[in-house]
Amino acid sequence: MPGLLSDILAWVVIGTFVAGAVANGRDRELGRRVMTAAWVLFALFWLQLIPHFTLVHKSYIEGLLTIAAVPASLYAGWLLYNGRDTLFVLSRAVAAMGVVYLPFETIPAFTLLGATVPAPRGVLMETVAAQTRFLIESLGYTPQMIVGDQGYLNTFLWMQGSHRLEISVVLACTGLGSIAIFAGLIAAVDAPMGRKLRGLAIAVPIIYALNLLRTTFIAISVGKQYFHLFVDEVLFLFGSSDPYMVSFFISDRIISQALAVVALVGVTYLVVHEVPELLTVIEDVLYMVTGDEYDLRNELGLD
């Protein structure tokens, strides 16, 4: 995230969703009003992230999704306020996603009773970086592992002649975001705990393993400059002047992000066979996009 104010806003948004979920259990109409307010705040949250993803992060896919999230959040709040009660499930899911993700994003290292407790993000990033290093070295490559800009041992140093190429495993490279999405969705639906746990047992290992393949692919592709192709066109497309970034843009921003969408669809297909209640959320999203009602349980033969 861009900074402290963004982190604070994120906690306010998630806190409002959690408050709405609690209120909904006691007074449905109060819960509806609180969750509607949460969706408006969620739209503001995505709005302030647009410059980060489009101008700083230079990700077309994430940038477009962030832009789309603003009206989508407002529309979800409007539908919920006007009686589409199935959106209570999606609202609870957003609350649970935030509870899973934000501690890693925002909690710093601290000292407790004389013992230093490391930042959760640092532990996760260093763990993923170490496992990525194992895969890279298993393929015969030997980049040096160094401490990155954030102070964690999460960065690979490659040399192209006399030019240093540093590729860091940041929080967005850990798979946590996708894991939080599925954890939130599964936690939010009304289903037996056994099936929920089976759904998590499917989603989490697959996402984590695929993410390790992704970080390995990107680190090698950038370190060895395997996608140094269409240099002028790619630099123009992403607004950059560094030719060494071309392999990164192609391997990460184009190939990996496109494959990530396909992977998420595949994981969703597997999970809904264990937790078909998730289809309620998918049906709501499809309704928001198309304006048509769907019965996915019947279409997928999951009744």
From Swiss-Prot:
The keyword Ligase belongs to this UniProt entry's keyword annotation: no
Localization in the cell: Cell membrane
Site (Transition state stabilizer): R253
Keywords, sorted A to Z: Cell membrane, Hydrolase, Membrane, Protease, Transmembrane, Transmembrane helix
Gene Ontology MF term list: peptidase activity
Catalytic residues in the record: C173, R214
The keyword Membrane belongs to this UniProt entry's keyword annotation: yes
InterPro entries: ArtA, Exo/Archaeosortase_dom
Gene Ontology cellular-component annotations: plasma membrane
Record's bilayer topology term: Multi-pass membrane protein
Annotated family: Belongs to the exosortase/archaeosortase family. Archaeosortase A subfamily.
Protein name: Archaeosortase A
Lineage of origin: Archaea, Methanobacteriati, Methanobacteriota, Stenosarchaea group, Halobacteria
